[in-house]
Amino acid sequence: NILSLYTSHDTAATFIDKNNKVKVLEYERFVKQRYAAFTQTMSYREGLGTTDEQRESFLQYIKDNVKGEIKIIIISDPDVNDYDIIKSYFPEAEFHIIGHHDAHASSGYYTSNLKEASILSFDGGGYDATDGECYTRTYVGKGDNITIVKSYNYSLGIPYGHLASCIKEIKPGPDCDKHSLVYSGKIMGLCGYGNIRPEWIAAMTYYYTTMQQVSIPLNQLGESIGLNLDFNSIEGQDAYDLAATSQYVFEQRAFAILNEMLAQGTSKDIILVGGCALNVLFNQKLSQRLKDIGGTLTVPPYPNDCGLALGQFLSYTQKKTKVSAYAGFDILDRDKFDDYKEKYKATKCSISNLVDHIKDGKIIGILQGESEIGPRALGNRSIICDPSIKDMKDILNSKVKFREW
């Protein structure tokens, strides 16, 4: 049997379980720590590292649920410092390495119904066995094979997310104020309040071409457009317009990459993977453009790093594989259900009762079956409420989701 482990932030494991199901287990759900990393090389980013006790519990859970004996373990980083602890649970296993973007591409293509596709993998970067650090790459999938088309030495994810560090209204996550993993989603949400500033586009485009890991290009951008872009330095309409202009440039650069690939006669059926594939504003525009030329857009439910363990697994097996969007953990404390019923004086609730509660402004949590994989709630671990009720968005964000907007 094969075990695939992605051990950086958004750690996950993929294997075949005793019921012959493909499992994709997200570590953050197991340790109750958002973006949790199995590897302790991430401990320098506050809130991401985990303890040996947590790591051992996760490996034991895998060992208890995997089918047969693990002979192959797939990882993405040859510098991973976790060989010893992994090897102690699976002493007979050989280690194999699959590159970051190869895994992303595989997670999208091998789980799709497409016999041929053009693939764009783009994010904040990751290790590749041949190119070292790699940020953006295009591929062609055909039959059971995936072939690299072109690698790009710039990231769209890093400049997009890093821009949020200067906006006061965006609360950074706990991991690191300058490289917070929450930034990209929040600045995308802020775009709706802003307008594209045509006079900023040239400077923003230059920022995108130079920004990788350092803050100097952000300071240069601020000088070019007349804003102080230090940490938590701007707010209001300038901040909103900065977000909207950044979104515009992000989209133009992503379209340019795809147009370059399509100009070579590759398939008009596009698969997007990598963290940038969570940018639904871009995805909507791309979907319409592809529809106009007879193409389609596919984005798997797990395009970000939580899907890398699955991608590594599929890159190794190179087989089209049906993977349920509900391939995650079963309810981890199912055995305590009777205790909870007694403790909270639970009563059975019919569908009509639930509807009445929702109409009365209650917020309902849904917990059933095995969890979704990926960052989008799809009904098994979900929150539902009535959005037509005045201030419901603000109530939900303040009491449950703790979001700014």
Segments predicted by a language model, with ranges:
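A contiguous, well-structured pocket-lining segment that forms one wall/lid of small-molecule binding clefts
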Residues: 174-268, 280-292, 321
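Conserved phosphate-coordination/catalytic loops
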Residues: 49-56, 96-100, 244-252, 348
